[in-house]
């Protein structure tokens, strides 16, 4: 009986550990597209808002940090956000601006793509490993009213397993960068 209880207890711990690892891994989405590859996390507030880390073929030491926000708001001048620096708070710290680089119709509203810059992979990965969650809030700024363009002005992303995710993105980039062998017919 004692042996059975011991075995059951260890099996239970093993299953809990495997499930939590697989849950963190399932949160990440990895893709390769036309010379680029990325890892993405869905938002906790608006699932369609993605936090993306993009690497370009042959540039596997640099990562582009990108976020998308979806909005139902449809002001006639929403396309003027393209190219603008928008004020945000990141993890409750004010004073940041992120650049909108694409505004496109999406579903019943618009999707706005923002760049948070390009970073050395190891630098950004190390910084993000220190955090449990990454939160962005679009805020009012000089001549900019967040609620005019965004019905939901904030989102956050759980950074579970971010270190392993960055390793996978980099491995995918290196694989994408390797020359393909051509067969001679």
Model-assigned labels for residue ranges:
Residues 1-24:
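Classical Sec-dependent N-terminal signal peptides that target proteins to the secretory pathway
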Residues 23-185:
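A generic "folded-domain core" signal
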């Amino acid at each position: 009986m004692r042996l059975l209880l011991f075995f059951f207890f260890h099996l239970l711990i093993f299953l809990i550990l495997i499930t939590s690892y697989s849950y963190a891994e399932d949160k990440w989405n990895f893709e390769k597209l036309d010379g680029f590859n990325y890892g993405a996390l869905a938002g906790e507030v608006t699932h369609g808002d993605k936090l993306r880390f993009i690497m370009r073929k042959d540039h596997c030491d640099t990562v582009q940090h990108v976020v998308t926000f979806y909005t139902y708001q449809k002001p006639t001048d929403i396309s003027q956000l393209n190219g603008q620096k928008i004020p945000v708070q990141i993890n409750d710290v004010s004073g940041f601006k992120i650049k909108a680089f694409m505004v496109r119709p999406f579903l019943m509203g618009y999707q706005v793509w923002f760049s948070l810059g390009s970073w050395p992979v190891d630098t950004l990965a190390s910084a993000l490993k220190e955090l449990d969650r990454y939160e962005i809030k679009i805020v009012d700024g000089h001549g900019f009213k967040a609620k005019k363009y965004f019905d939901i002005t904030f989102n956050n992303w759980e950074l579970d397993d971010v270190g392993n995710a960055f390793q996978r993105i980099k491995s995918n980039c290196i694989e994408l960068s390797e020359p393909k062998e051509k067969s001679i017919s």
